[in-house]
Amino acid sequence: MNKKSIRDVEVKGKKVFVRVDFNVPLNENREITDDTRIRAALPTLQYLREQGAKLIVASHLGRPKGQFNEKYSLKPVAKRLAELLGIEVKMAPDVVGPEVEKMAGELRPGEVLLLENVRFYPEEEKNDPEFARKLARLAEIFVSDAFGAAHRAHASTAGIASYLPAVAGFLMEKEINFLSRALNNPERPFVAIIGGAKVSDKIGVIENLLGKVDVLLIGGGMANTFLKAMGYETGKSLVEEDKVNLAGELMNKAKEVGVKLLLPSDVVVAPRIEAGVPSKIVAVDSIPAEEMALDIGEKTAKHFREEILKAKTVVWNGPMGVFEVEPFDRGTVAVAEAVAESGALSVVGGGDSVAAVEKAGVADKITHISTGGGASLEFLEGKKLPGVEVLNDK
């Protein structure tokens, strides 16, 4: 990575503004149901504390629409962060202003102050320069560790970097390193697995990957649109009619550039999406008119597995079927197992693919699980991420 990281700056005794992604799920009692994102930031926070920095930590949570809303307060996060760090975490009553500046000014080395939800201010998402300056006033160095928000040009992810030295935290560094290694310098064969419901969400990714990969495996609801483009009848399956021509063009482009593009040869069909509904596996040329394709079939899973096992680099984004309803999760789990077994450099992104890897119990065998859904998608599209661009070059 050609951007400076926290290793490249002296932080001892300095106030450091750390933008993290603590956008965690809460239940109706406002208890955190999954603290993965908080844990992901711990190495950066621990390192900065050990180096004697004074930490001012900032994050968004949910979509409070630019106003204070207790429902989106970071108080439950402060409590969990304190448990994980094993220290007291001071909770600021606000994001900016004299009281917060006073609390930041009183911090001692190794202490942590968590600001309230940055999205309580409409200026955050507008990347308002005056608001960014107020955030910058709290500290002397800006550390970005929120890869999950790096595709957003907001005040706390990008704007603040105009006023302070800006460097990457360990999580941000790791994300950039693995994603760019896979995309820009892959060991071959390079296999990409793209799934999810809609082609429209993944057009940019497919177009960018066609110039880089050796094999492209397509599953999930989006595969139906490609099958339709090949002239197959898809019954009641989800198809984006307005994208059928585009799917055809992408298949032609793959041929032109010598990429092996594989679609399902068989699918699991059912009359509707619900657990326990009778389902069966059929070839893609025999999808019943009254049923819908909801997962890749066993032959496809086996075929995809063979391609994945040959790979030296694998990038996977999006499930192979309606993963959240059994038995339509089998194709996705089979792919997860193959990726884990391949021994390839593997990068998995997107909520559902990450959940699949965890469900299959193989998370520890994946080289890198990306914490940023939208950000990793834009990275795969070849876009520049504002939250990365603003960091100081080495």
UniProtKB/Swiss-Prot annotation:
Family membership: Belongs to the phosphoglycerate kinase family.
Annotated compartments: Cytoplasm
Name by which UniProt lists this protein: Phosphoglycerate kinase
UniProt subunit comment: Monomer.
HAMAP family: Phosphoglyc_kinase
Pathway involvement of the protein, from the record: Carbohydrate degradation; glycolysis; pyruvate from D-glyceraldehyde 3-phosphate: step 2/5
Chain sites annotated for binding substrate: 21-23, 37, 60-63, 119, 152
Annotated source species: Carboxydothermus hydrogenoformans (strain ATCC BAA-161 / DSM 6008 / Z-2901)
Annotated binding of ATP, by residue: 202, 324, 350-353
EC number: 2.7.2.3
Top-level division of the source organism's lineage: Bacteria
Catalytic activity: (2R)-3-phosphoglycerate + ATP = (2R)-3-phospho-glyceroyl phosphate + ADP
UniProt KW keywords: ATP-binding, Cytoplasm, Glycolysis, Kinase, Nucleotide-binding, Transferase
GO terms for MF: ADP binding; ATP binding; phosphoglycerate kinase activity
Keyword Transferase: yes
Keyword Protein biosynthesis: no
Major location category of this protein: cytoplasm
One GO-annotated biological process of the protein: glycolytic process
GO cellular component: a single term: cytosol
